[in-house]
Amino acid sequence: MANLGYWLLALFVTTCTDVGLCKKRPKPGGWNTGGSRYPGQGSPGGNRYPPQSGGTWGQPHGGGWGQPHGGGWGQPHGGGWGQPHGGGWSQGGGTHNQWNKPSKPKTNLKHVAGAAAAGAVVGGLGGYMLGSAMSRPMLHFGNDWEDRYYRENMYRYPNQVYYRPVDQYSNQNNFVHDCVNITIKQHTVTTTTKGENFTETDVKMMERVVEQMCVTQYQKESQAYYDGRRSSAVLFSSPPVILLISFLIFLIVG
């Protein structure tokens, strides 16, 4: 981690040094810059070439090369390249038409990676994610009949749960309660539309099964969440990263 921080700092300092040197270079005179590109030809802010009777080479009224009234190359009235009346590059209304197009939004790779690691986000469920498939737990319900019924029908019960990120809940009980409700609701609605109905015994057993899976999902997500926070804390507390952040603040303030 420390070696990575040192490499990042060295790369950033090198880049900023090159940018700083580029910014400090004097700008040469040219089109629309106020200075002259060639020494000894006019005062700063003047024409690139000495005027001849108010115009440029062969122009009576300040036009460009072969223009009577201030046009560009081959334009009679101040147009751009190939435009008769103030057009830009192949645009009748100026150059801003083609340069102000909105750029395509960039995909936030960090969010995509986080969603892939946590689970697939389910559309239409308000931010719920679908966990990975689990083995249904072997449960006992207090009597032989229910135990046998469960073993014979457990394949009809969910093996995945719906949940939201753990940081949206204050404790495990709230997470599990919400997880159980949305999972059973989605499973029963989806399965009922296929022609299968659930009895009260089925619902009772589903609640037990889904509760166990939601507890497992909470433990998994909670561990991943705290591991991520701890890794971030270690990264930002390393000396190279602290030095890099201080250097960035110095550049911004300075």
From Swiss-Prot:
Keyword Cell membrane: yes
Keyword terms of this UniProt record: Amyloid, Cell membrane, Copper, Disulfide bond, Glycoprotein, Golgi apparatus, GPI-anchor, Lipoprotein, Membrane, Metal-binding, Prion, Repeat, Signal, Zinc
Amino-acid positions noted as binding Cu(2+) 1 in the UniProt annotation, renumbered to this chain: 61-63
Sequence repeat ranges per the UniProt record: 51-59, 60-67, 68-75, 76-83, 84-91
Residues annotated for Cu(2+) 2 binding in this entry: 69-71
Residue positions binding Cu(2+) 4: 85-87
Major localization listed first in the record, in broad terms: membrane
Membrane topology recorded in Swiss-Prot or TrEMBL: Lipid-anchor; GPI-anchor
Comment on protein domains: The normal, monomeric form has a mainly alpha-helical structure. The disease-associated, protease-resistant form forms amyloid fibrils containing a cross-beta spine, formed by a steric zipper of superposed beta-strands. Disease mutations may favor intermolecular contacts via short beta strands, and may thereby trigger oligomerization.
Protein's recorded name: Major prion protein
Source organism of the structure: Rattus norvegicus (Rat)
Gene: Prnp
